[in-house]
Every structure is written in structure tokens, then in C-alpha cells.
């Protein structure tokens, strides 16, 4: 038995997390050579099917025991999902070898995109401060909703975004006071920046502010320099400019009881108490297992501060105005700590009534002022990579953090999903086009009743038509109203939607089968719909004891 050839393509990546039409994107192919002699690159080609996107010949050498990355720009004019195949021909020791590797690019329509600006100009934590470059998962999630995240790396970029109609939301995470560079240059918002952000919100833009625990300001360089404005004070200047009654506390949220139960640090908190807010729609809480992540979606709040409200005079108040909606409450055992001993945290931070005789600290809240955009305030960066897991499977058998669902609800509000009628989807003959449909389930999923289900799929129907959706797991049944997102595909002559996401959004009366003729059956005009046909069977074909046609 010979040894395996240690030569080929290790990876193909795209430099753009949200590819869009009409915009060049860089695709990089990394080659590896673990053999003892160099390998010449005879050619490299990028193609979608038979369409060549880019190609080159005699482009270099992959050194022995080394790697080489080759990058090329490609672009697309039509929004759809593309499978791009990289084909590389390598020559080593007089022999040629051909290697291929695919990358799937979900190219969005540039005209449908909206933008979220993420401030990176103030050493913002999780962006350009500590844990920098930790917003990628949120950016990838945003792309699924035709939303692109853009880091605003300078003051000019931040101000420009505030007047750009493509931008619908700004995210301002806490300006670091922990990073060494930030301690030397503790950045705050200029008068011009505050005015621009206020104008953005007044024009309907959503502004999200996140804090961080004053544990990350408990350093001699800060303690010995009263001129350094703390993170909470810096963020609160923005909130004041917006006319908001919400504030971020200069404190840390600790919990002795839950940290002991969970075996974590006192500031590593998992909250499970939610307010009445669209942001928490669909968040799962099992009253019988409120702390068990096998049953409940908890809110991850790491190293965070609390959130409170001020009255008309700017003084802390334990009464929330009608404009404010609590989103996430702390546990009843959670308390405020003044870690940096500046007298601003601790027992004087207001709590808010969650239930009778049960007032709690707030971890997150929103405010809707008349005629303005939404304001969302959190004591920590709830959308960082650590809180927004890329997929549920990242957590094994446990449920995902509710942060993920909160971000989904936020993105839906920023750019509502465009629902396409099923007839339009059926009319699309080219594979790879992404659509979202809503309709009534007309066949049970195997997860609900295997005896009456098709294999790993369901049919969904609206007023214009029906279509097969594959693959589908879960207990979806006849009469459920579902929202399905997927790409067009054809299987044995039948158009279908290759499902990327499906959710139940209601229930209704099951669809009544449409009475049709054999002509309609044969011409495909009712393909995918629930029908009934009257007539006589004159023939059928069997295979493995089952009727095939």
C-alpha cells in the first residue's frame, strides 16, 4: 500500500463575509505541499459550472514542506447562491495532479442591503479594543437578513455613516479603558460625533450602546487620573445627547448564588428573566428548568454593568418611564458592585419591579422616543462572538444563548424579511436563487408522523401555489403556518426549495384539496399543490413493494 500524496488544496476562502452583486470579492486558495520537493503551479481556475470566472497559468511554486496562497477577484451580477469550484493543476517530479475544492457564496442583491455601522474609532471593546475583531458571528448572522455590518474606523467614517441613508443602525460598544493604548489615549465622543449620532437617531436610525464592568477600570493609571472619563460616563454622554432616559451604571454585576451553582466567576452571568419586548420574541424559558441550558435559552452577560433610568432632572429613578421597555432582568440574587470605588456603583444603583416584592437590576432595556429611532442599552456587548454562537451546534446538546435570538429579532426589525409568493418561486427555473416563503403545511414531517410523511420533506402552499421543501426536521404538521428560507433546486423534474431555515409562525385550518383534471396534473400547472383527482386508474408501476408512478 503506497503513501497518500501530501499535496493539494487545504482551503478556499472569501475575503468578504457578505458578498453582494456588482462588487469584487477576493477568493483565496491555499495550497499545501508536505512532500520533499517543490511543486509547480501549472494553472488555477475558478468556475461556476462551465462558466470560468478567473484563470491563470504558471503562477508560481508551492515549496517543499510549505504552503502558498493565491488570491483572485471575482464578481457576480445576479443575486443567488453560487458554488464556485477552484481547480488547480500541480506538477511535481514530472507528474501532473489535478485538485478541486468548492466554496459556496451567497451573493446578495446590493440594492436590497441595509447597513449597520459598528464604531471602531474609540478603542471599542470587542471591536478595536480588548477581544478585538469579535463581531464576526454577528456580521455573518446579519448577512442572512440582507444586512451588512461595517466597522467605522475613524471619526470621519462614523460621522459620514450617520448621514448615509443606507445605514439603519449604529452599534457603540464600550470605549476601552483596559487596553494600554486606550489608557494613554482614553477616547470620548466629540461634539461633532454626538451631534451626528443624535441626528441619526432623530431621523429614525437605531442606536445600540453597550457598557462594560468597572472592574476593567480598576487600574492605577485610571484611579490616579481623574481627568480620564470612565466608560459609563462616556456612553451616557451619547444617551444624554439622544434625549434618552436610560443610562449605563459605573458598576459591575455580581451574583454569589448563581456563580456558585454554575461553577463560574461572580461576573460570568446567565440571566433567564425577560421583559415584554419584541427583542425577546421566541426566547425559550422552561419554568421547571429555568437555569438548565438543556431547556432554557439564557442571556449571556459577561463582565457587564447594569442599566438604569434617570428622571427629568437627570437623577437615578426606580420608576421606568412609559418610553422604556425592559428586555433582560438580572437574577433576584444579582447585585451591583462598585469595584473601582468611585462611589457610583453599588447599593445606589436603582432596581426595577419585575414582580410583586421582587425588584431587580436591569441588564438590558430599550427606549422608543416619539418620532425617533429605537435606542437599545445593554450593560455588556450582547452581540459579540462569545455571546452570538455561529450555530446551535456550537453548544452541543445545550440550547443557544438567547443573545442569538435577540440579535435575530433585531435584524428582522432593521430589515424585515421579504416574503415571495410560491408561484414566483416555482417559476424560477435556475438553481441557487434564495427565497423566503410563508404558507400552510400540506403534508406531515417525518418528525411528527413518519407513517404519513414524505422522506425528510414537507409541502407548503399559499394562495398562489405549492412547493416541496427539503430537508425538513422537526414536528411540523398539516395546518401549521411556516416561514421557510431556502434556495431553488430541482429533483427528478420537480422544483423544490432547499431549506436553510424553517420556523412555525402559526396554525390554521388545513388546506382543502383542489379538484383538478388529469390534464392539469400532466402539464405541471398544479405541481406542489394539494389536489384531488376523480377518475379510473389504468396503470401503475411498483418498485420494492411501493407504488412509484
Task: Please describe what each predicted stretch is.
Residues 2-9, 509:
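Proline/serine/threonine-rich low-complexity linkers at boundaries of modular beta-sandwich domains
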Residues 59-67, 476:
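Short proline/glycine- and polar residue-rich coil/turn motifs
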Amino acid at each position: 500500500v503506497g503513501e497518500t500524496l501530501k499535496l493539494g488544496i487545504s482551503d478556499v476562502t472569501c475575503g468578504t463575509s457578505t458578498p453582494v452583486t456588482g462588487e469584487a470579492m477576493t477568493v483565496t486558495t491555499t495550497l499545501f505541499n508536505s512532500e520533499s520537493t517543490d511543486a509547480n503551479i501549472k494553472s488555477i481556475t475558478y468556475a461556476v459550472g462551465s462558466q470560468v470566472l478567473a484563470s491563470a497559468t504558471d503562477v508560481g511554486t508551492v515549496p517543499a514542506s510549505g504552503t502558498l496562497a493565491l488570491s483572485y477577484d471575482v464578481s457576480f451580477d445576479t443575486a443567488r447562491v453560487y458554488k464556485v469550484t477552484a481547480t488547480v493543476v500541480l506538477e511535481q517530479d514530472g507528474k501532473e495532479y489535478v485538485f478541486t475544492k468548492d466554496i459556496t457564496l451567497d451573493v446578495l442583491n446590493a440594492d436590497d442591503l441595509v447597513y449597520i455601522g459598528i464604531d471602531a474609532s474609540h478603542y471599542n471593546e470587542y471591536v478595536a479594543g480588548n477581544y478585538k475583531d469579535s463581531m464576526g458571528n454577528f456580521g455573518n448572522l446579519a448577512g442572512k437578513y440582507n444586512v451588512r455590518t461595517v466597522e467605522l474606523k475613524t471619526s470621519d467614517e462614523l460621522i459620514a455613516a450617520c448621514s448615509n441613508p443606507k445605514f439603519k443602525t449604529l452599534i457603540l460598544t464600550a470605549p476601552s479603558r483596559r487596553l494600554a493604548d486606550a489608557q494613554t489615549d482614553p477616547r470620548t465622543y466629540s461634539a461633532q460625533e454626538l451631534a451626528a449620532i443624535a441626528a441619526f437617531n432623530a431621523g429614525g436610525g437605531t442606536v445600540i450602546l453597550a457598557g462594560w464592568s468597572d472592574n476593567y477600570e480598576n487600574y492605577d493609571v485610571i484611579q490616579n487620573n481623574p481627568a480620564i472619563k470612565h466608560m459609563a460616563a462616556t456612553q451616557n454622554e451619547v444617551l444624554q445627547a439622544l434625549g434618552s432616559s436610560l443610562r449605563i451604571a459605573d458598576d459591575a454585576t455580581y451574583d454569589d448564588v448563581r456563580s456558585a451553582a454554575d461553577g463560574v466567576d461572580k461576573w460570568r452571568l446567565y440571566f433567564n428573566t425577560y421583559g415584554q419586548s419584541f427583542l425577546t420574541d421566541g426566547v425559550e424559558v422552561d419554568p421547571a428548568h429555568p437555569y438548565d441550558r438543556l431547556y432554557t435559552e439564557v442571556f449571556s452577560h459577561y463582565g457587564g454593568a447594569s442599566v438604569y433610568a434617570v428622571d427629568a432632572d437627570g437623577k437615578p429613578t426606580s420608576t421606568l418611564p412609559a418610553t422604556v421597555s425592559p428586555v433582560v432582568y438580572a437574577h433576584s440574587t444579582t447585585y451591583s458592585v462598585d469595584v473601582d470605588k468611585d462611589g457610583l456603583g453599588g447599593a445606589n444603583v436603582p432596581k426595577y419591579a419585575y414582580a410583586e416584592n421582587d425588584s431587580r437590576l436591569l441588564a438590558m432595556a430599550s427606549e422608543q422616543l416619539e418620532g425617533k429611532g429605537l435606542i437599545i442599552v445593554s450593560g455588556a456587548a450582547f452581540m459579540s462572538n462569545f455571546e452570538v454562537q455561529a450555530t446551535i451546534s456550537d453548544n452541543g446538546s445545550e440550547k443557544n444563548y438567547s443573545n442569538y435570538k435577540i440579535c435575530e429579532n433585531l435584524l428582522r426589525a432593521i430589515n424585515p424579511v421579504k416574503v415571495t409568493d410560491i408561484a414566483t418561486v416555482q417559476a424560477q427555473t435556475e438553481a441557487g436563487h434564495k427565497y423566503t416563503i410563508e404558507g400552510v403545511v400540506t403534508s406531515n414531517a417525518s418528525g411528527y408522523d413518519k407513517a404519513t410523511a414524505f422522506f425528510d420533506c414537507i409541502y407548503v402552499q399559499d394562495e398562489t401555489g405549492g412547493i416541496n421543501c427539503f430537508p425538513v426536521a422537526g414536528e411540523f404538521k398539516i395546518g401549521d403556518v411556516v416561514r421557510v428560507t431556502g434556495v431553488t433546486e430541482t429533483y427528478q423534474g420537480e422544483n423544490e426549495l432547499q431549506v436553510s431555515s424553517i420556523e412555525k409562525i402559526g396554525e390554521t385550518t388545513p388546506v382543502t384539496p383542489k379538484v383538478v383534471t388529469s390534464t392539469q396534473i400532466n402539464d405541471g400547472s398544479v405541481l406542489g399543490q394539494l389536489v384531488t383527482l376523480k377518475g379510473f386508474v389504468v396503470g401503475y408501476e411498483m418498485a420494492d413493494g411501493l407504488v412509484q408512478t
